[in-house]
Amino acid sequence: MGRESLAVVSSPPSATAPSTAVSATSLAPGFRFHPTDEELVSYYLKRKVLGKPVRFDAIGEVDIYKHEPWDLAVFSKLKTRDQEWYFFSALDKKYGNGARMNRATNKGYWKATGKDREIRRDIQLLGMKKTLVFHSGRAPDGLRTNWVMHEYRLVEYETETNGSLLQDAYVLCRVFHKNNIGPPSGNRYAPFMEEEWADGGGALIPGIDVRVRVEALPQANGNNQMDQEMHSASKDLININELPRDATPMDIEPNQQNHHESAFKPQESNNHSGYEEDEDTLKREHAEEDERPPSLCILNKEAPLPLLQYKRRRQNESNNNSSRNTQDHCSSTITTVDNTTTLISSSAAAATNTAISALLEFSLMGISDKKENQQKEETSPPSPIASPEEKVNDLQKEVHQMSVERETFKLEMMSAEAMISILQSRIDALRQENEELKKKNASGQAS
């Protein structure tokens, strides 16, 4: 949600109550401000240091080291019960010219832990990230708590205006509370409270409801008509989970029916024979239209995207069906091999079965491809009478094709020999196992 634009959407005011501004302080259920480290540094912190506005003002400014961590929630611009907050804070140097910062509060202090981590975009260094843990009391006898802060700062960056170094002017702090000491495995998201949203008030949600405007187009009769279908919110969209149905007269709007009828309505003429010819032409055209399949676009004028999704779904189903059909070519042979190797219980038998199936599929796919090519060649329309040069070229192509087929047959023969050798080895192994079982049975009966 870090890259999404956000807009304030409020419920329409009542007729009696005056219109009031909606406070953009709460996110709608399911939406959370959760930017990445790169977005926090390269967008929010950088624009704050340069004094540039941001599209979504979600981070408040507070002197974070003058307040206890459990008191910081009231300074957050996003009113949420989630145990995670974001703030801008100015650094307070412990000494005027030194590099050490004063991170002590009235009841404790923030202590850095581990090394600062680099935030990069590919090879470009954007900023640094410091992890701090709040300790209650005074150093070095402070007690570690479950309050953690990630402090983001920019690397040395010269502003575009005066060239002064302002990388230490502000830092961005992400404060959160863990359930226990250790990695943040606990759930920092607060449970949903239905009563908080019972009034249906304004909420901050991502995205803007953009409506497409359709310009008026000149019609054939010279009148400019605006298509009101794009602005109507009461019409039903197509359900992509249902198959398309045939168009009915109710699906065609009255203006379309009138236009359709006027397009085929014969003009009045004093000549009775001309009128009869026009009427016969009209009947033929209507008969041709009855034979045509019904148009599906009439049902989907307001839903081009679901129609595309439906087409994609049908295409995926056709691809799956074609893959199933390809696998069915060798189903009988694979079943025979599986029945032959039913008695094999070792891992070597499974590997051999896989190899046999692969060889069978390879050979049968090649044979099916050649059959399809032959069928296409047989069904191709006869070519016109060719010149002697073209006949010679055709003969050369046939000779080349025959040589290619001969090489293909050689490969198929080699694969068949390999399969025969594999099957023979398995037969020998089964015979040996059978003899061993017979010996064991004979020794068991003798004893």
From Swiss-Prot:
One of its GO terms (cellular component) is nucleus. Pfam families: NAM. InterPro entries: NAC-dom, NAC_dom_sf. Mostly expressed in floral organs, and, at low levels, in other organs. Signal peptide: none annotated. One of its GO terms (biological process) is negative regulation of transcription by RNA polymerase II. It is found in: Nucleus. SUPFAM superfamilies: NAC domain (SSF101941). Residues 1-21, 246-303, 371-392 are annotated as: Disordered. Its main location: nucleus. Residues 27-178 form the NAC domain. Interacts with JMJ14 and NAC052. This is NAC domain containing protein 50. The lineage of its organism: Eukaryota, Viridiplantae, Streptophyta, Embryophyta, Tracheophyta.
